[in-house]
Amino acid sequence: MGGASKKPISTMEKRLKKEAEKQQKAEEKKKGPSKTGKEIISRAVTIDEETKKKVLDEIKKESIITPYALATKSGISISVARKILKELENQNVVKLYSKNRRLEIYIAAS
């Protein structure tokens, strides 16, 4: 009754090569660019006049407006719709009616 047989030398060499490659890839990932100085990406959104007109028309048509509704009707992302609505709230075009952690409901300012 013998135990398990030893693995061949070629199998051991292949395993060692794979481990060495994994270590190299891990080191390359660690040496990636740091997020300091000029490497930080600006997330500012600029809105063109055509999009603003679309948004204002949608707001006039609807009694209430949410970021999701605005995004689907205007063809923009929800995050951009949120930013637009916040900007319009600061300009007193819309008024925040209700808010919880997931949803913001706006109405047209009268």
Swiss-Prot record:
GO terms for molecular function: structural constituent of ribosome. Gene3D superfamilies: 3.30.63.20. GO terms for cellular component: cytosolic small ribosomal subunit. Keywords: Ribonucleoprotein, Ribosomal protein. Residues 12-37 have a biased composition (Basic and acidic residues). Residues 1-37 are annotated as: Disordered. NCBIfam families: PRK09334.1-4. Belongs to the eukaryotic ribosomal protein eS25 family. This is Small ribosomal subunit protein eS25. It comes from Saccharolobus solfataricus (strain ATCC 35092 / DSM 1617 / JCM 11322 / P2). The lineage of its organism: Archaea, Thermoproteota, Thermoprotei, Sulfolobales, Sulfolobaceae.
